[in-house]
Amino acid sequence: LYGYFNSKEELFYAITDPVVNNLMEVLDRIRSEMDALPKKERLYGMGKVYYPNIPKIVDILIADRDAVKLIVNGAKGTKYENFLDTIAGRNALTISKTVKNIEEKTIRPIKEQTIEVLMEGYIATLFRLIISDKDRETIIRCMEMIGKIYETGIIALMQKVFMGE
């Protein structure tokens, strides 16, 4: 196998790049769809854009679980070393940007760093499910449920009523 590649790094990227590229294409499309929502609907409409795409995300990742395992467990020293954190950061930025642009008076922004920590937990959970031996339907169902818990929780944290203000 090494005869086809000049280095282990070249082999690593030959295995992992297709999965990452396919995933990022879907995530970029989702973000564009979210950005296209009217400002007034964006915070509460993000889930309506995201949830129908969970099966596509799961399909991309389970199509090559070995590549995903390499990204999660063997990416130290590669361009994918912080890949999960990068995705979490993108999600946190999208949420923070949405909240900053919202005109609703009952919502107050929470620190982007806090949202990023929450997103890191969510993304780590997604990837743990992918590298587990769970079947596609179980992963999709878990991701939908966990996503709704995170969505509801983040919105609750932003609501002034929740904070007693």
PLM region spans:
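Residue-level recognition of alpha-helical structural elements
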Residues: 43-46, 50, 76, 80, ...
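Short, hydrophobic secondary-structure boundary micro-motifs
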Residues: 69-71
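Solvent-exposed, amphipathic alpha-helical segments
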Residues: 22-33, 67, 121, 125-129
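Residue-level recognition of oxygen-bearing side chains
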Residues: 7-10, 66
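Short, flexible, glycine-rich and Lys/Arg-enriched loop motifs at helix boundaries
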Residues: 25-50, 98-106
